[in-house]
């Protein structure tokens, strides 16, 4: 297809009347793909911004822009810009199927000579934001109007109110007088024809107040956000209310109740226009408001998916409009509640408490229940009224009483956990247990040390078989503090002279031959000493050399005297 002649710098091309607006473009390519085939909607000169990180540093250059509509459903709608109006190869191609938002009358926080006298609008895609500057306001309005016609963005005349308005939030709830108008175009949405549909609805004033006959269906937009590019609407209940971003202006007018004129009308000001996928996070927390007559018209509950059936049954309001569909059976509400609460049944309430319909049998499987009824007893003895809090245990006895007692015990007392033994630590050796000395008598030593003038040594005494089992321990202690180092102080146990039955002990122990003198300390034969019990070691014997001990004492005394004589008195000053 030949390029437009370079002589008219700006021209407005009317849309092709034989082109039917499609709800999606399933085979659209990525941004940057060159597409030369398609219908040219508009072309002209615009000043393009550099990348977002270089807005202040680089120059805003003037480029020749061409807005093309895809020739077939597989061709994307693109906005191409060239170096000049005679170039054959575009510098870049912007895929409008990826356009998320269109803002008009954009102002930046810095001033540049190229944009001071122009009118700026931007196109936001998932990859980059393009700031475009037109020389006149009329030129900017024509560009915005043409882009909105392709992308399916909804336009509004500004009435002094400035702000961002999401196109996904427009027309989500229509009045009860419009169901036939909004629903009659469902076949045209599912099967596109060659003739554009025309809306016959009267445009109401925005914002539309929510009518009382609207039900809240949760997360319809979030469930279909990823399928916004599908070829047709999935289910009938979501068809007139979920907004598709690349639907034509006429289709948006059908859903929202607006009738939009052609491209010839001029728009004096625009609000921010965005596609629904940008506000997907908002719809997850918000809800749509859908008339019940439209949600239930043309399909049954069986045609809905599982999530849609749950959302439809979760609403607790009934519509007051819509003719014969104003009332809904209670079974559907019962199914909806049971779908959210599996394993639980709803019991209806009645005016009479004594009737069988208002009582729940406490133990239906027990064999005593029919016998009680045959005996003519009151039904309240075996039934619990639904609306009453009083429970009678007259006839049912064991199972329920045990259950109630178990519940009271479980609620009143918490289960006590076993104590934690914190001494059990890994890689830690346990301390040895102390010996049991309860049966052993503690040896009481004498508080004084009686001097013995003559050393003596004791030999082993002769005992019988009972006393020979315990060895006789001896100990020698020498007092080195006394001036007479030859004297020895012995600590004999007074119990050593205790006579033993069946044995004899010598009154005068003989002297031992040799230089080593031992001191014999006799303990009770029947009670072992603590040293032998606790340590279990052999007793050491010490040999004392008198000459060396005396020489050492003299040397220490001489050194102490020499040190005292060499030190000056404390009061003297050097």
Curated annotation (Swiss-Prot):
Polar residues biased stretches: 181-193, 302-318, 424-442, 502-513
**Per its UniProt record, what Pfam families does this chain match?**
PH
Which residue intervals make up region (Disordered)? 1-33, 176-200, 215-234, 293-331, 418-513
Domain PH: from-to ranges: 39-152
Sorted alphabetically, which SUPFAM superfamilies does this protein's record hold? PH domain-like
Superkingdom of source: Eukaryota
Give GO BP annotations, semicolon-separated: signal transduction
Q: Where is the composition biased (Low complexity)?
A: 457-478
Q: One Gene Ontology cellular component annotation?
A: cytoplasm
Molecular function as annotated in GO: transmembrane receptor protein tyrosine kinase adaptor activity
The family this protein is said to belong to: Belongs to the GAB family.
Protein's name according to its UniProt entry: GRB2-associated-binding protein 4
Q: Which source organism?
A: Homo sapiens
Gene assigned in the entry: GAB4
């Amino acid at each position: 297809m030949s390029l437009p002649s370079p002589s008219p710098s700006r021209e407005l091309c009317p849309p092709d009347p034989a082109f039917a607006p499609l709800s999606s473009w399933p085979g659209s390519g990525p941004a940057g793909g060159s597409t030369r085939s398609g219908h040219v909607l508009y072309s002209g000169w615009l000043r393009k911004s550099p990348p977002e990180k270089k807005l202040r540093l680089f120059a805003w250059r003037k480029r020749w822009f061409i807005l093309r509509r895809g020739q077939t459903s597989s061709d994307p709608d693109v906005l191409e810009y060239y170096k000049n109006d005679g170039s054959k190869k575009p510098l870049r191609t912007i895929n409008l199927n990826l356009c998320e938002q269109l803002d008009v009358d954009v102002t930046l926080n810095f001033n540049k000579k190229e944009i001071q006298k122009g009118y700026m609008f931007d196109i936001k895609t998932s990859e980059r934001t393009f700031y475009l500057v037109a020389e006149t306001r009329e030129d900017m309005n024509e560009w915005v109007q043409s882009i909105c016609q392709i992308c399916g963005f909804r336009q509004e005349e500004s009435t002094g109110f400035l702000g961002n308005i999401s196109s996904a939030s427009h027309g989500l709830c229509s009045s009860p007088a419009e169901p036939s108008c909004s629903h009659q175009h469902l076949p045209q949405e599912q099967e596109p024809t060659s003739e554009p549909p025309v809306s016959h609805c009267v445009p109401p004033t925005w914002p539309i107040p929510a009518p009382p006959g609207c039900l809240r269906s949760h997360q319809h937009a979030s469930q279909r956000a990823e399928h916004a590019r599908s070829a047709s609407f999935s289910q009938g209940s979501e068809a007139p209310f979920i907004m598709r971003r690349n639907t034509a202006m006429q289709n948006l007018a059908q859903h929202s109740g607006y009738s939009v004129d052609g491209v010839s009308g001029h728009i004096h000001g625009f609000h921010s226009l965005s596609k629904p996928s940008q506000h997907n996070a908002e719809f997850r927390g918000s809800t749509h408001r859908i008339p019940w007559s439209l949600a239930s018209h043309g399909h049954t509950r069986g045609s809905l998916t599982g999530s849609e059936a749950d959302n439809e049954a979760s609403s607790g309001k009934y519509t007051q409009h819509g003719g014969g569909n104003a009332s809904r059976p209670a079974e559907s509400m019962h199914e909806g509640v049971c779908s959210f609460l599996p394993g639980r049944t709803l019991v209806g309430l009645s005016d009479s408490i004594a009737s069988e319909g208002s009582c729940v049998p406490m133990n239906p499987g027990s064999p005593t229940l029919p016998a009680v009824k045959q005996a003519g007893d009151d039904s309240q003895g075996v039934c619990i009224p639904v609306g009453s809090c009083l429970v009678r245990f007259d006839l049912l006895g064991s199972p329920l009483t045990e259950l109630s007692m178990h519940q009271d015990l479980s609620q009143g007392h918490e289960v006590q956990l076993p104590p934690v033994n914190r001494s059990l630590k890994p890689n830690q050796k346990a301390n040895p247990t102390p010996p049991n000395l309860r049966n052993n008598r503690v040896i009481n030593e004498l508080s004084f040390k009686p001097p013995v003038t003559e050393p003596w040594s004791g030999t082993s005494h002769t005992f019988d078989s009972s006393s020979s089992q315990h060895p006789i321990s001896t100990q020698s202690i020498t007092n080195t503090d006394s001036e007479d180092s030859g004297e020895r102080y012995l600590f004999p146990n007074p119990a050593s002279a205790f006579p033993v039955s069946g044995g004899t002990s010598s009154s005068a122990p003989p002297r031992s031959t040799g230089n080593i003198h031992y001191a014999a300390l006799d303990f009770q034969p029947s009670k072992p000493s603590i040293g032998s019990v606790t340590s279990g070691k052999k007793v050491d014997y010490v040999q004392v050399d008198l000459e060396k001990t005396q020489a050492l004492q003299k040397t220490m005394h001489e050194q102490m005297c020499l040190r005292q004589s060499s030190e000056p008195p404390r009061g003297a000053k050097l």
